[in-house]
Amino acid sequence: MNNPAMTIKGEQAKKQLIAAALAQFGEYGMNATTREIAAQAGQNIAAITYYFGSKEDLYLACAQWIADFIGEQFRPHAEEAERLFAQPQPDRAAIRELILRACRNMIKLLTQDDTVNLSKFISREQLSPTAAYHLVHEQVISPLHSHLTRLIAAWTGCDANDTRMILHTHALIGEILAFRLGKETILLRTGWTAFDEEKTELINQTVTCHIDLILQGLSQRSL
């Protein structure tokens, strides 16, 4: 029989190792050492082998953690999108609201300091993809990208399978990602010191304005 106290202790150790590994892998990629990861986690280096196996296995465990985290954050949006798509004629106001909510959620996540290591990890994988990226892509990025494409296509009357529609969706997502990947630029240009609640709301308003322009523009012209 499992000892509940030992099980809780083990889960805590795994969480600490994942958090430390995300920070180290995000900063150094696979050049990160298990010794530094264990030290940052406050764990014995043998704990990595015990809980995960090799360094490569720990790297994939980080990717799975990211997939689970993103999936949890956006699952309500995906489920609501499916309910909308199941309707014979989805309400356009509801479609727009769901697009805005998904984008607001992305902005919220990408302006928080505690998701920086996640962003670093994914950015490395975007530029030099490994099996870890494909894991995250298949489980959450591709489904969420597809849902947003379908929502935009449904509102504008465009074909969701058209490559140009996918590109328009990707460009919109890129506009939001710019506030994470280009964070230092916008802080210096605006004179801000950080993304607090007030600044994040201003970003939300700006992106909402752009989304409405994009939706109106695409609905009034061919792709």
Swiss-Prot record:
Observed phenotype of the null mutant: Mutant shows increased sensitivity to chloramphenicol and cefoperazone, a third-generation cephalosporin.
Domain HTH tetR-type stretches: 11-70
Keyword match Disulfide bond: no
One protein family per Pfam: CecR_C
A molecular-function term among this protein's GO annotations: DNA-binding transcription factor activity
Induction pattern: Negatively autoregulated.
Role noted for this protein: Regulates transcription of the cecR-ybhGFSR operon and the rhlE gene, which altogether are involved in the control of sensitivity to cefoperazone and chloramphenicol. Represses the cecR-ybhGFSR operon and activates the rhlE operon. Acts by binding to a palindromic sequence within the intergenic spacer located between these two divergently transcribed operons.
Name under which the protein is recorded: HTH-type transcriptional dual regulator CecR
